[in-house]
Amino acid sequence: MSCNQQKECCKKECQEKECCKECCCPRIKAFKKFINTFEKAQIGKEAPEFKAPAYCPCGSIKEIDINEYRGKYVVLLFYPLDWTFVCPTEMIGYSELAGQLKEINCEVIGVSVDSVYCHQAWCEADKSKGGVGKLTFPLVSDIKRCISIKYGMLNVEAGIARRGYVIIDDKGKVRYIQMNDDGIGRSTEETIRIVKAIQFSDEHGAVCPLNWKPGKDTIEPTPDGIKKYLTAH
């Protein structure tokens, strides 16, 4: 951003280096003010609604309506951009995981700010050319950034989604929000562990302790329950 686009207070600093500080950049400041007008995703609250075009596993472009996923758990997988570096490893990994998630009534939806045609080209490209090949879940185009804003996943300065995901339960409520630095890939094993923990807690009313996995002990959420668990462990 040039000095002509900055406030007077920033011009001196801009002569030495590019400046994108919120206090000095009117465009970023105005955009952040606009973002604050949106209701953001919150744990335990209804997941923000959206409809958007997506490139689907069948090879066609269709509209995704998050409301149509009621009755299922959803992993809403935000990522920075197609044709990058960590992102393809994650999309391929979650594509392999999608079958296991379907077995427990959970779907994966990828979301980035790329166009559906960029998604299509990425999925049709061979891995030797930086593509991801055919995925088993849809890639939504959030080209207007509205979905990323609603779910608190937009990197405002870069204008792209952050590397994070949101788990929505079968009743349409947000149950888990996680975000990584752009250079750190996620764990598919941790994702499925969290989904199973949410489902177990919903079904049985128990709570899941540190490092819980299916088959491990849970805790009855009462004073006696935690005493019993801590004594046994």
From Swiss-Prot:
Keywords recorded for this protein, A-Z: Antioxidant, Cell membrane, Disulfide bond, Membrane, Oxidoreductase, Peroxidase, Redox-active center
Alphabetical list of InterPro entries matching this protein: AhpC/TSA, Peroxiredoxin, Peroxiredoxin_AhpC-typ, Peroxiredoxin_C, Thioredoxin-like_sf, Thioredoxin_domain
Organism of provenance: Entamoeba histolytica (strain ATCC 30459 / HM-1:IMSS / ABRM)
Thioredoxin domain residues: 41-200
Keyword Oxidoreductase among record annotations: yes
Catalytic residues (positions): 87
Protein name as catalogued: Putative peroxiredoxin
Any matching Pfam family: 1-cysPrx_C
Subunit and interaction comment: Homodimer; disulfide-linked, upon oxidation.
Bilayer topology annotation: Peripheral membrane protein
Family: Belongs to the peroxiredoxin family. AhpC/Prx1 subfamily.
